[in-house]
Amino acid sequence: MEKIIVRGGNRLSGTVKVEGAKNAVLPVIAATLLATKGTSTIHDVPALSDVYTISEVLRYLGADVHIADETVTVDATGPLTVEAPFEYVRKMRASVLVMGPLLARNGRARVALPGGCAIGSRPIDQHLKGFEAMGASVKVGNGFIDAEVNGRLRGAKIYLDFPSVGATENIMMAAVLAEGTTVIENCAKEPEIVDLANFLNAMGAKVRGAGTGTIRIEGVDELVGTTHTVIPDRIEAGTFMVAAAITGGNVLVQGAVPEHLGSLIAKLEEMGVTVIEEESGLRVIGPEKLKAVDIKTMPYPGFPTDMQSQMMALLLKAEGTSMITETVFENRFMHVEEFRRMNADIKIEGRSVIINGPCQLQGAEVAATDLRAAAALILAGLAADGYTRVTELRHLDRGYVRFHEKLAALGADIERVHEETEQFDQIQTIQWNG
């Protein structure tokens, strides 16, 4: 087992480049299954374990997938199987995104119930509601979701009870080959939705309204492979913005898109952080003293739940009382106990957390509880006295590429070691060939 060891106290400075967006590339890779002609080529693909997992799912289904030099090439023109087994899907809940493409193309999909981060109840009922509205018969049992339709899916009007990103993506992918027109109301508006729509349209789909509350999809008879470059990762960008702020540093986050980060920029500026838009990204300059603020997570364009734990780390250093309210996911405060191990004055009240700052953070041995919590604990370590040791790095590797190396290049005192010996060891990278 590996751990990251960080000694706090260093101000970060320099430039860090943002990778392609994990939450955009996964549905785009799933969507390549829709192409019955040609090969799809995707650029700026981050070298993450989740990308490897969904690529393995596609290979199991019958697609030919090659990954090298931040590029994924998929040929799914041959026959596909309809079942994605538990051994793959358990690793990552985004694997359920193959369901829409399989149902649209083959008329049947059998997918194991998903895994991924253990963040409370993350039901997929909205996905299934959409499939049923388009004429599919859906059954859930024995750890699997079975969906089947006679002939083609039919266009339908679908209202989502909550603007779920995954449901919006899955229904979009199912609808592009459906007979007739599908309208998705109260859909997700995230930049990753727009990116998926752009990819689908480049394949020959007719998707309109992505980025608004209503998406209209006119079904087509076939889709063709295309070339696509994934948008930059706004959550990785936000994480490095917080890293600059928590250390009082001066960092240019190269590739950060201001339009994708409006709510985060607003909260950082409210805390006294300087954010400057430059030609290649965003420069973030941390103040000597941070101000307390209140945050409520909301669907985009509201404050992203995926930045909640990182901002919690930052608010531990702010003067005054702050409150964070989580409205998107249940049980996303598991990292609070780990912050307490670092001397954080923090308590949970229902779906909110109360922080009394500034806290004199102290280095401690802590365990990551999910992907974003892993990054947040490292951020807290950057501002703590002494050494912080973060374990359960499998969570971190699902969403960040060479995270400790990027921080070290900015001046952080950080290394990744084997737990048994604590000898410095370079991160084990996935072999992206084959």
Swiss-Prot record:
UDP-N-acetyl-alpha-D-glucosamine binds at residues 93, 122-126, 306, 328. The modification 2-(S-cysteinyl)pyruvic acid O-phosphothioketal is found at residue 117. Pathway: Cell wall biogenesis; peptidoglycan biosynthesis. It holds the Pfam family EPSP_synthase. Belongs to the EPSP synthase family. MurA subfamily. Cell wall formation. Adds enolpyruvyl to UDP-N-acetylglucosamine. This is UDP-N-acetylglucosamine 1-carboxyvinyltransferase 1. The lineage of its organism: Bacteria, Bacillati, Bacillota, Bacilli, Bacillales. The gene is murA1.
